[in-house]
């Protein structure tokens, strides 16, 4: 898919992989909405690349819905979603202070897995609302898994589980969306 002129949403866009992705999409001519909990840092990058920064908590249905609407209002419905929002706090199952707090594990799952699904469902709805391009495509969704999903290390139980969930979610999502012209795939950096 040629991204030039198409609306793109990147989560976790204030830093790291998300920032690099937003930059690359803008360089190819995409209209980029940079979603991040840290709207200030996303704003600095958005100014630099000609995009728009939108504060977004990917774990919140309401926040994500508002962010996708703001992106749609600015650039039109998304044809591209790249989900890079994620956290990776290293934490042993049982450390010096005792068992890992369940909330630590739950929070990683909320951000990395549920947050990815939250944006996937909203972007997919935007893509399906549009007519296909001449190529038959309606859009592309790229989820960020990690090599940790397949080869996690000590202290990565929550992170590996969350990224394994992203990898496992992507195949059925790809199968479901393919007939409608939306490609869904996952990358696994590391």
Task: State each model region's role.
Residues 87, 98-118, 142, 166:
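Catalytic Tyr-X3-Lys loop
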Residues 28-44:
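Conserved glycine-rich Rossmann-like NAD(P)H-binding loop of the short-chain dehydrogenase/reductase
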Residues 39-40, 55-67, 102:
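The beta1-alpha1 cofactor-binding region of Rossmann-like NAD(H)/NADP(H)-dependent oxidoreductases
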């Amino acid at each position: 898919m040629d991204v030039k002129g198409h609306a793109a949403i990147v989560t976790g866009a204030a830093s790291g992989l998300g920032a690099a992705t937003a930059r690359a999409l803008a360089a190819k001519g995409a209209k980029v909405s940079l979603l991040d909990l840290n709207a200030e840092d996303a704003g600095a990058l958005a100014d630099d690349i000609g995009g728009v920064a939108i504060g977004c908590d990917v774990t919140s249905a309401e926040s994500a819905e508002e962010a996708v609407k703001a992106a749609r209002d600015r650039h039109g419905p998304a044809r591209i979603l790249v989900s890079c929002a994620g956290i990776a706090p290293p934490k042993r199952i049982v450390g010096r202070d005792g068992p890992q707090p369940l909330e630590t594990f739950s929070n990683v799952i909320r951000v990395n897995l549920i947050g990815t699904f939250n944006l996937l469902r909203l972007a997919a709805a935007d893509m399906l609302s549009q007519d296909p391009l001449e190529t038959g495509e309606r859009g592309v969704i790229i989820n960020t898994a990690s090599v940790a999903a397949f080869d996690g290390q000590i202290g990565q139980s929550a992170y590996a589980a969350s990224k394994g969930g992203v990898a496992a979610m992507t195949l059925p999502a790809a199968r479901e969306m393919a007939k409608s012209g939306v490609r869904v795939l996952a990358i696994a950096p590391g």
